């Protein structure tokens, strides 16, 4: 067994690897950038080495610095985790050449599967079915358009290198093809250093089903069954499960055999995933799946496989790289129950899933209800430099319905403040009828996006509790305070307090008065309610109109977030003396919705633009975001340049004021 492992990663995967190493008695070394100096993975590791500035390109993607850190710490192996350098064959070979063990496949195996076109050709030779498409090297836009027309729309443009949904675009028509190709190429170049793309037929009722494989250096390869990753948004996985619902046993066997065959074709050793796309238009069938790509690393969603097989995949990685054979044969592996994983992100689903940046002021995760893999804690800063994942919530049960119910229950108990999260979106998705009935597909989220992301109005009891919290009324009274037990009293008038709250730009007026110990009368937007907020552990039990509600109120300096039934509402106090702060002409400004890089500018001073026309493209947290003109008009000012880093709310462009309408 290894003596000391350096984890060349950050966040939840670094923490997860560290925990298995500690269980096995293997010493650990973390690496960190400036932004991660106080990160959880740094605190958990036995020691930590600083590797550079905050941008990943200068730290977590610097192979030379990581190898040097391993030597300085006396590590005998490097675990790359996922992302960053995990599928970089040059890094794997450099680590090996330096005398370190790379906890993953060989550089040759990574290289063989890293370019999707070459990988598909290799799979065809190994008799593994592949999706119809163009996988050649000609990148001329006219030629690629002709290939797309030959294949037939809709098509999928995919980056030749890399994965994770980067450089991927679904295109419905020939008219939209060129812009989509250019965008995919820019994104691919930024993410992988290779702008080339391939074209594939888009399956109209697709299921994303992948097989976990594992090989060793003794020629053994097994599969650990399938995962269904069909719930996706913009090709990014959202909720994964294992096994796949509706999977016939003959198809499970056929897919497993195909995955093993794929791994054997490249002499694979270590953990890997063979991703297939399956046509579910007439149910899952053994002849209705095709190879998409192989991920030559541990997957984000590996915990669901661990849950149904009882296998610690990181432990297997450590044993295999130490020269041991696989701990189990294929006939010793079986499926036990069902498991789900939901990816909890700092992002605002109601605002188009914009990444949320800032301090994570408060964080409660339901560790008594689910397995929680997290790399952050309260007080951490969610930065623009890395993926904004907060945690993975994993549940297991004897059957699908039980495991899914446990997931929904666990998600309802997530409470985070300081930054927006997608917890409510995930819970709604877990309860979506088609998904609950076992009918997932990659288009499900898009079809139901409106109801999954709509803003729910705050119930009166939520608003009233927010007002009481911000007024200080819920703070415990001093011991033996005689006034605490008396109804409010003011000379000549009823004792009432008034506050105005702001929720996403909407103001709501609340008045309330004490009606005895622990009782209040409140008026919310003209509706009278009686409120009896009593504490039950860390929750408030409120009674309104004869019904009891369980709520949580987490207060900041001048704001409060109230949680109820898996939904949350953030309120801030409105200063009654403050006037309207909206500046005239604000609608003529195109501003940055988050910190990031100005990737592309399509506007010049004096240019006429149309409403909805893309004027700039920003990149942040590995996403491209198009900013469009709010109205027809003419560009008055361009305040930034391509390649410039900007802060949230920075003004990028200004339109000329609209001409005044002559009513004469």
Predicted regions mapped to residue ranges:
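Structured functional modules or segments
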Residues: 580-664
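N-terminal beta-alpha lobe that positions the nucleotide/phosphoryl donor
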Residues: 1-274, 278-302
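Short acidic-glycine loop/turn motifs at beta-strand connectors
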Residues: 173, 215-220, 278-285, 322, ...
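Catalytic P-loop NTP-binding/switch module of NTPases
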Residues: 548, 554, 558-593
């Amino acid at each position: 067994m290894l003596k000391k492992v350096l984890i060349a990663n950050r966040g939840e995967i670094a923490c997860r690897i560290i925990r298995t190493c500690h269980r096995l008695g293997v010493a650990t070394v973390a690496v960190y950038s400036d932004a991660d100096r106080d990160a959880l993975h740094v605190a958990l590791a036995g020691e930590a080495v600083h590797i550079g500035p905050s941008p990943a390109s200068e730290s977590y993607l610097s192979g030379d610095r990581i190898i040097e850190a391993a030597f300085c710490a006396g590590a005998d192996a490097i675990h790359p985790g996922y992302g960053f350098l995990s599928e970089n064959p040059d890094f794997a070979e450099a680590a090996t050449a330096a005398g370190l063990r790379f906890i993953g496949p060989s550089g040759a195996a990574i290289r063989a599967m890293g370019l999707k076109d070459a990988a598909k050709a290799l799979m065809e030779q190994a008799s593994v079915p592949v999706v119809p498409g163009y996988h050649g090297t000609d990148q001329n836009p006219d030629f690629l358009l002709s290939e797309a027309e030959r294949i037939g729309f809709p098509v999928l443009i995919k980056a030749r290198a890399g994965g994770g949904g980067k450089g991927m675009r679904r295109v419905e028509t020939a008219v939209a093809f060129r812009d989509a190709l250019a965008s995919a190429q820019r994104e691919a170049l930024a993410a992988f250093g290779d702008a080339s793309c391939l074209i594939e037929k888009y399956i109209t009722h697709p299921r994303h089903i992948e097989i976990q494989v594992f090989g060793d250096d003794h020629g053994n390869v097994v599969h650990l069954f399938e995962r269904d990753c069909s719930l996706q948004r913009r090709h990014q996985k959202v909720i994964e499960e294992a096994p796949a619902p509706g999977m016939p046993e003959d198809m499970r066997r056929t897919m497993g055999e195909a995955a093993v065959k794929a791994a054997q074709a490249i002499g694979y050793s270590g953990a890997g995933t063979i991703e297939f796309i399956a046509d579910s238009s007439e149910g899952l069938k053994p002849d209705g799946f095709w190879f998409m790509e192989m991920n030559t690393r541990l997957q984000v969603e590996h915990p669901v496989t661990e849950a149904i097989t009882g296998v610690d995949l990181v432990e297997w990685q450590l044993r295999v790289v130490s020269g041991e054979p696989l701990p189990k044969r294929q006939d010793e592996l079986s499926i036990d129950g069902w498991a789900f994983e939901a990816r909890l992100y700092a992002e605002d689903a109601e605002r188009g899933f914009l990444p949320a940046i800032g301090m994570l002021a408060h964080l409660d995760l339901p560790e008594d209800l689910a397995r929680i893999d997290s790399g952050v804690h309260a007080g951490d800063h969610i930065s623009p430099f890395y993926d904004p994942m907060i945690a993975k919530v994993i549940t297991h049960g004897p059957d699908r319905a039980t495991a899914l119910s446990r997931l929904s229950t666990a998600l309802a108990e997530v409470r985070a403040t300081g930054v927006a999260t997608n917890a409510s979106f995930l819970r709604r998705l877990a309860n979506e009828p088609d998904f609950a009935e076992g009918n997932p597909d990659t288009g499900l989220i898009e079809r139901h996006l409106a109801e999954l992301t709509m803003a729910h109005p705050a119930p009166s009891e939520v608003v009233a509790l927010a007002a009481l919290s911000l007024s200080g009324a819920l703070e415990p009274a001093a011991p033996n305070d005689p006034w605490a037990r008396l109804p409010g009293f003011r000379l000549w008038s009823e004792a009432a307090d008034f506050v105005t709250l702001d929720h996403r730009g909407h103001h709501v007026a609340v008045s309330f008065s004490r009606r005895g110990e622990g009782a209040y009368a409140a008026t919310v937007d003209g509706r009278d309610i009686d409120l009896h907020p009593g504490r039950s552990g860390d929750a408030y039990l409120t009674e309104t109109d004869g019904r009891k509600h369980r709520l949580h109120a987490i207060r900041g300096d001048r704001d409060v977030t109230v949680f109820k039934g898996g939904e949350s509402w953030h309120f801030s106090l409105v200063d009654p003396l403050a006037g309207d702060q909206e500046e005239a002409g604000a609608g003529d400004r195109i501003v940055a919705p988050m910190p990031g890089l100005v990737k592309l500018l399509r506007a010049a001073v004096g240019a006429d633009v149309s409403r909805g026309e893309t004027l700039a493209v920003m990149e942040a947290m590995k996403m491209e975001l198009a900013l469009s003109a709010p109205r027809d008009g003419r560009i008055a000012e361009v305040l930034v340049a391509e390649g410039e880093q900007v802060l949230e709310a920075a003004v990028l462009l200004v339109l000329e004021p609209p001409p005044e309408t002559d009513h004469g």
